[in-house]
């Protein structure tokens, strides 16, 4: 399964990456000011969005907490 992380390089972004790697996701990390701008991030996810933002497949899951809940609900932590 594939996942995309929109990252600004903070600890939660790194935690999301480690978590997804441990669950054998193929990960693409898009980095602020390298792959997208803050303005583009806000346009895509809204002004209240925090880093990281995670997409699993074609589904936008949300931040790290939402990603953990999504994975738990899908039984990925068994």
Positions of PLM-derived features:
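Conserved residues at beta->alpha junctions
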Residues: 7, 32, 58
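Non-catalytic, surface beta->alpha helical segment in thiol-disulfide oxidoreductase systems
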Residues: 56-78
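Thioredoxin-like thiol-disulfide oxidoreductase module
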Residues: 31-48
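Alpha-helical elements of the RecA-like P-loop NTPase motor core of helicases
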Residues: 14, 18, 39, 69
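Local sequence-structure signature of Cys/Sec-based thiol-disulfide redox active-site neighborhoods
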Residues: 1-28
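Short alpha-helical
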Residues: 11, 36, 62
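Residues at alpha-helix termini
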Residues: 23, 44-45, 74
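Structural micro-motif
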Residues: 45-55, 64-65
């Amino acid at each position: 399964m594939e996942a995309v992380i929109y990252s600004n390089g903070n600890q939660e972004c790194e935690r999301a990456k480690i978590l997804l790697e441990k669950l054998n996701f193929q990960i693409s990390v898009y980095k602020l000011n390298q792959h997208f701008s803050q303005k583009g991030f806000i346009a895509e996810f809204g002004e209240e969005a925090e880093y990281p933002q995670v997409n699993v497949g074609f589904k936008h899951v949300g931040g790290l907490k939402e990603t953990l809940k999504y994975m738990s609900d899908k039984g990925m932590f068994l």
